[in-house]
Design a protein with these regions (language model features):
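A compositional/biophysical signature of low hydrophobicity enriched in polar/charged and small residues
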Residues: 1-133
Length: 133
C-alpha cells in the first residue's frame, strides 16, 4: 500500500478540508475532478482512506492514561469502541495500559466518562490548554 506523490497531495488537500469537491482538489493538484475521484476510490479500496471526520476544538481534548485493575480487556475495548466521544484509543506499553483521546464540551462530561472507566481501573488525565500545531 504505497502512496505516490499525487495521492499524497490529494490526502493533504483532504486533511485541510474534506468537504472540497473533487474538482476543487483537482485544480489544486493539477488533475481533473474525475481523476481525483478515481484515485480517492482506489485509496478507499486499499484501506489508505478509511473514513471522513470532523475536527473539533483542540482544547476540548483530554488525554487519558488508563491503568487497568482487572483483566477485562475485551470488555473495556468494546466499551471504548461504543463511546463516540473517545476519538482514539491505543493499547500501550510503558506507563499505563491504554492511552485515550477523549473529546468533551464540559468538565461534567469528562467527570461522567471517568466515573464510567472506574470499574476497569484508575486514570491519569491531561487536558489540552493550547494547540501548538
Amino acid at each position: 500500500m504505497s502512496v505516490d506523490k499525487m495521492n499524497q497531495a490529494i490526502l493533504n488537500q483532504l486533511r485541510l478540508n474534506s468537504r472540497k469537491t473533487w474538482q476543487q482538489i483537482g485544480k489544486d493538484v493539477h488533475l481533473t475532478g474525475q481523476a481525483v475521484a478515481a484515485r480517492v476510490a482506489q485509496m478507499e479500496e486499499q484501506g489508505i482512506i478509511s473514513g471522513y471526520t470532523i475536527r473539533q476544538d483542540q482544547l476540548s481534548r483530554h488525554f487519558i492514561t488508563v491503568f487497568m485493575q482487572n483483566s477485562e480487556f475485551t470488555r473495556f475495548e468494546n466499551f471504548l469502541r461504543e463511546n463516540p466521544r473517545v476519538e482514539s484509543a491505543y493499547k500501550v506499553t510503558g506507563e499505563g495500559c491504554y492511552q485515550l483521546c477523549f473529546i468533551a464540551d464540559t468538565p461534567q462530561e469528562v467527570e461522567r466518562f471517568l466515573d464510567s472507566v472506574l470499574p476497569f481501573g484508575r486514570c491519569k488525565v491531561l487536558s489540552a490548554i493550547r494547540c501548538v500545531k
